[in-house]
């Protein structure tokens, strides 16, 4: 289960602290003696009761909305594969920039957020390098300057960043998160380049419940569903059970020759390489975040999150640059 959306009451730093704390201007509520919610309920529990419901009404309230979403987003404008720190950052920027676009976010896990609920080695704090602090300012996430290095800032708990970003993404009316849903394949169309009769473009994704995907090897055939979209943004992370999926699929469908393979950890070179090389790798498919390290052979970045955020910003920028052209191509050849 994902952690709930976090609130944060700014407190004065201890006298021994030399770190400067960034304090967002937004106010945060807390349960105090003057809280409206306590005024509403405190001391009245003997007379408390919930309104009466019927179980089928609960079922219908859930299923009706979900199937309406499936119908609405069967034709999407943009699909984002992977709701980690990079994918959610992409969704946030796109949601703000283009509220007219239908954006589907597909996440294999029950809990979106990827590895961004904690820092390195299951520690709480999240470390990032400037100028990624500007993204935190835009989100309204508080952070501290790091006394040991003026180029670094620290969020007191990674979950504070992820819950804030996730809550903002989910508040956009044009974005739908389908979690516990796996992308099993890519929808393709022929797109021959000059002198090349075998080129392809990506035209959407093939989906299934994650629990179904995990059992294809021990159950009979369970066919998938589909979402058409002129542009797919893949941010599935480095190689793993579901990681680097689109990158690996491009190799198996002969769209690219081979993967570069992620190199050993080097934060300084890895972060800049990931941000600067976030791009459309084939028509209709943008790849960002650590998935790029598998395609290009960049270094691993480890427990630092600046590039994840700004690669998401860059992926959104690339999407805005190419979207209208990809949309026209899909309209021309359905």
From Swiss-Prot:
Coiled coil: none annotated. During the catalytic reaction, a sulfide is transferred from Cys-221 to a reaction intermediate, generating a dehydroalanine residue. Substrate binds at residues 86, 107-108, 115, 183, 223, 238, 290, 300-302. Binds 1 Fe cation per subunit. Its EC number is 2.4.2.60. The keyword Cytoplasm applies. One of its GO terms (biological process) is thiamine biosynthetic process. It catalyses: [ADP-thiazole synthase]-L-cysteine + glycine + NAD(+) = [ADP-thiazole synthase]-dehydroalanine + ADP-5-ethyl-4-methylthiazole-2-carboxylate + nicotinamide + 3 H2O + 2 H(+). One of its GO terms (cellular component) is cytosol. It is an enzyme of class 2 (transferase). One of its GO terms (molecular function) is cysteine-dependent adenosine diphosphate thiazole synthase activity. It holds the Pfam family Thi4. Keywords: Cytoplasm, Iron, Metal-binding, NAD, Nucleus, Thiamine biosynthesis, Transferase. It is found in: Cytoplasm; Nucleus. The modification 2,3-didehydroalanine (Cys) is found at residue 221. Transmembrane segments: none annotated. Its cofactor is Fe cation. Belongs to the THI4 family. HAMAP family: THI4. Homooctamer. Involved in biosynthesis of the thiamine precursor thiazole. Catalyzes the conversion of NAD and glycine to adenosine diphosphate 5-(2-hydroxyethyl)-4-methylthiazole-2-carboxylic acid (ADT), an adenylated thiazole intermediate. The reaction includes an iron-dependent sulfide transfer from a conserved cysteine residue of the protein to a thiazole intermediate. The enzyme can only undergo a single turnover, which suggests it is a suicide enzyme. May have additional roles in adaptation to various stress conditions and in DNA damage tolerance. This is Thiamine thiazole synthase. It comes from Ajellomyces capsulatus (strain G186AR / H82 / ATCC MYA-2454 / RMSCC 2432) (Darling's disease fungus). The lineage of its organism: Eukaryota, Fungi, Dikarya, Ascomycota, Pezizomycotina.
